[in-house]
């Protein structure tokens, strides 16, 4: 609570870094919030950036998040990039004096998490990591069953999650494989 600050103007000026599927999901939601204004969008993949600009044509486009962070007209950022970019962007955003909302996971390594934690503690900004399943009824019920002892000691777990589509996405040319399908590669997804 002590880190919460009153915004000095009528609307929170938000920038999105990463405008793929999750970034566009956030754009749709932000457009429904009267006290939020999307002022900038950033992506280094031109088709995603173009789609974001179609959704919010008044936003300033960027291809380099560092240039976006230099803007004094941005109060906070939403980070929806591949996981390997979370730590560097969060750290740079806090250093630039921006509030930060970042998609899960926080970072790839404990050292990166510690660096984020330390930097956040030195800032006066709000930092939040999106953990969408944490509040899902099924997960809450499962944790209640574990904590109550209803199912005994948990010694192992096997889980499957079925998506509506394959994780692999089509790529327009082979050199974009790792950029578009980053979730499938250890160096970018953990």
What are these regions (language model features)?
Residues 40, 76, 156:
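Short, Asp-centered acidic motifs that coordinate Mg2+ and/or phosphate
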Residues 35, 58, 73, 150-153:
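Glycine-centered tight turns that cap/initiate beta-strands
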Residues 76, 82-83, 87-135, 149:
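Beta-strand-loop-alpha-helix segment that lines the small-molecule cofactor/substrate pocket
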Residues 65-69, 143:
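Short hydrophobic/charged patches on amphipathic alpha-helices used for structural packing
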Residues 1-56, 136, 146:
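N-terminal Rossmann-like dinucleotide-binding module
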Residues 18, 125-128, 133-190:
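Predominantly a Rossmann-like dinucleotide-binding segment in NAD(P)-dependent oxidoreductases
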Residues 52-59, 115, 119-120:
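Short, conserved SAM-binding/catalytic segment
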Residues 60-64:
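Conserved SAM-binding strand-loop segment of SAM-dependent methyltransferases
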């Amino acid at each position: 609570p002590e880190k919460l600050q009153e915004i000095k103007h009528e609307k929170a000026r938000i920038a999105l870094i990463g405008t793929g599927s999750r970034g566009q999901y956030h754009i749709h939601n932000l457009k429904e919030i009267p006290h939020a204004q999307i002022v900038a969008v950033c992506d280094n993949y031109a088709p995603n950036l173009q789609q974001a600009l179609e959704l919010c044509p008044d936003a300033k486009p960027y291809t380099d998040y560092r240039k976006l962070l230099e803007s004094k007209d941005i109060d906070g950022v939403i980070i929806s990039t591949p996981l390997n970019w979370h730590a560097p962007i969060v750290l740079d955003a806090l250093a630039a004096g921006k509030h930060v909302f970042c998609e899960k996971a926080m970072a790839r390594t404990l050292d990166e998490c510690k660096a984020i934690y330390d930097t956040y503690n030195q800032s006066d900004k709000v930092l939040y990591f999106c953990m969408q399943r944490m509040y899902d009824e099924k997960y809450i019920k499962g944790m209640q069953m574990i904590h109550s002892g209803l199912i005994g000691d948990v010694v192992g777990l096997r889980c499957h999650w079925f998506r509506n589509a394959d994780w692999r996405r089509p790529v327009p040319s082979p050199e974009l494989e790792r950029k578009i399908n980053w979730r499938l590669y250890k160096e970018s997804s953990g």
